[in-house]
């Protein structure tokens, strides 16, 4: 009788163990079944690819691009500053009109260049160089016909220089957007040169 009881208990224990093992296996299987499958063929995108941007744009600029961008930024600032002087200080209607045109057109070009720089991740200069500052200070100190002669002389010489620099960038630049800026701005500069020569001829 005692042996029979022990046998029954042993059978119950074994049956219980098998049931627990079966439950554990089923739970493990369910967990695997409900997990999302991993597709190893899907590409893994980095942050640059997701955003569609890269931090290498500015470093990819050629020395020609950088030199042009810097010169155009400083030259554009000077044209606006001198144009403001002409519009406010000159008593010659032609010279005043020339100054207004410089402020408007170069202000627009400066904004376009700043937008390009922001997109390219390039830092433009925010002040005139020493030579440009001296030219501005000298012009600011002049009055009347002397001012008009100095201003129109500067506009003729500066725009000849600007046109040469913009043509060089359009031909030799590497960055497409900056080359396009140079090409599309050239007709405006050529018009400025023509108007500057007319204004210079009107000054007595």
Please provide the spans of the model-predicted regions:
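His/Met- and acidic-residue-enriched segments that coordinate or traffic transition-metal cofactors
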Residues: 2-6, 11-204
């Amino acid at each position: 009788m005692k042996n029979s009881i022990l046998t029954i208990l042993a059978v119950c224990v074994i049956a219980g163990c098998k049931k627990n093992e079966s439950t554990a296996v089923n739970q493990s299987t369910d967990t695997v079944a409900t997990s999302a499958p991993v597709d190893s063929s899907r590409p893994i995108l980095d942050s640059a690819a997701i955003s569609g941007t890269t931090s290498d744009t500015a470093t990819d600029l050629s020395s020609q691009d950088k030199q042009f961008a810097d010169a155009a930024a400083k030259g554009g600032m000077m044209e606006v500053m001198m144009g403001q002087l002409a519009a406010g200080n000159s008593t010659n209607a032609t010279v005043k009109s020339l100054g207004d045109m410089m402020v408007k057109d170069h202000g627009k070009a400066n904004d376009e260049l700043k937008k390009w720089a922001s997109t390219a991740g390039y830092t433009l200069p925010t002040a005139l160089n020493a030579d440009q500052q001296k030219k501005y200070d000298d012009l600011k100190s002049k009055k009347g016909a002397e001012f008009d002669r100095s201003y129109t002389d500067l506009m003729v010489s500066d725009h000849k220089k600007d046109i040469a620099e913009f043509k060089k960038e359009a031909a030799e630049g590497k960055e497409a957007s900056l080359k396009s800026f140079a090409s599309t701005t050239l007709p405006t500069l050529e018009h400025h040169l023509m108007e500057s020569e007319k204004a210079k001829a009107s000054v007595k």
